[in-house]
Amino acid sequence: MKLVQFFEIGQQLLKTKDFVEKNKNTTVVTLSYEKLLTLQNSTGGDNLQVTATLPNPSPEIFKKMIAIVSNLRKEENGFFATNQMGTSSNRAKSTDTPAVSTSQNVGGANEPKTILISKFLNKFILLLPFFKNSLQTLSDRLVQQEKMLKELNSTFTKITESQKSLKQLYKKTISQYAVVSSKFIVQQNNFKKFQKNLKQFASEQRLLKFLPKLRYLPTSQTKMYEIVELFMKKFVDPKLSYPMEQIYDQKLKFTSKKIAATRKQKWQRLEKYFGGITKMAKMNTKQISKNVAIIIGQQEEMNAVHECRKLGMKIFAVVDTNCNPKFVDHIIPANDDSRNSIKYILGEMLTYIRLGQKLRKKVSLRAKIQQNRKKRFAY
């Protein structure tokens, strides 16, 4: 808008200049405002008569004009062949005073007239081609920017459409995945139930093979019960565990109370001291070597120490001055005769053993969860 206004001002100035130059009796002279004042003072103002005045534009537009001219002078040195001090004084005065065009009438009406124009306005006319070119470039840029905006709008609409389609696809895939995962979980549970039923059916078939043979055996009910229990342990459920008191009562049913009580006491005592050996018989050497033995009183328990060394079990022992530390893997130097020291050591060890067992359970649960996740993603 500024360039358009300046271009219109320059065109109006050109028209006035051309109109004045067409008249043969008039001549145009460009002067600065200071020279015009000195000329009036020197002649006394008698011969110089002001017939017409050409007012300057508004102060705001005039300041903008001055700023454009000063910028152009910085960019193109030598474009204006005027003195810097003269132009600055002219600009300062021109903002406050109008540009005066005068006609000098010394003789009659047919004598030639001179018209004085401000030097700044005369030089501002030279900027018309620059304004024209700049307006053309600005219009070209606007056209290019409009094209770019149209292209950007088209690409933006395409992106939004593709984004909507992708969102719909994502929702569909999530819904399908949820349906598939639910079906998979149901089928997995059904498969586990089917496996359990198959195992039970196989174990029942194994048991039924031996039942016809038991029919013809001349045995009592107690013996039959024991044989069926043995078959149940070996073929149906090997992990089945029975309380020992129930077994004692079944075997001592038909004996007197006195004999039953004495035998039961003997069996309980034997179970107390040698019950762990039965479980050790079912374990491998690797499983035994993973266990740990805590021994207090090495001299009294040398047999246990030798057995642990044969089986490869690690030994934690409270070692006193009368003990041999060579037979021990992990030494705990303390008094093995005092009750308080033994109680403190065993209490601390128990707390950390239980903590380790809890941590092992948590780690095993996490490992199972990760395996289940891997299996799901594999399918």
Swiss-Prot record:
Region of interest (Disordered), ranges: 83-106
Region (N-terminal extension): 1-94
Pfam families attached to this UniProt entry: Ribosomal_S2 (PF00318)
GO molecular function, one term: structural constituent of ribosome
Keywords recorded for this protein, A-Z: Chloroplast, Plastid, Ribonucleoprotein, Ribosomal protein
CC terms in the record's Gene Ontology section: chloroplast; mitochondrial small ribosomal subunit
Subcellular location(s) of the protein: Plastid, Chloroplast
BP terms from Gene Ontology: translation
Similarity comment: Belongs to the universal ribosomal protein uS2 family.
HAMAP family the record matches: Ribosomal_uS2_B
Protein name per its UniProtKB record: Small ribosomal subunit protein uS2cy
Organism: Tetradesmus obliquus (Green alga)
Taxonomic placement: Eukaryota, Viridiplantae, Chlorophyta, core chlorophytes, Chlorophyceae
Gene that encodes it: rps2-2
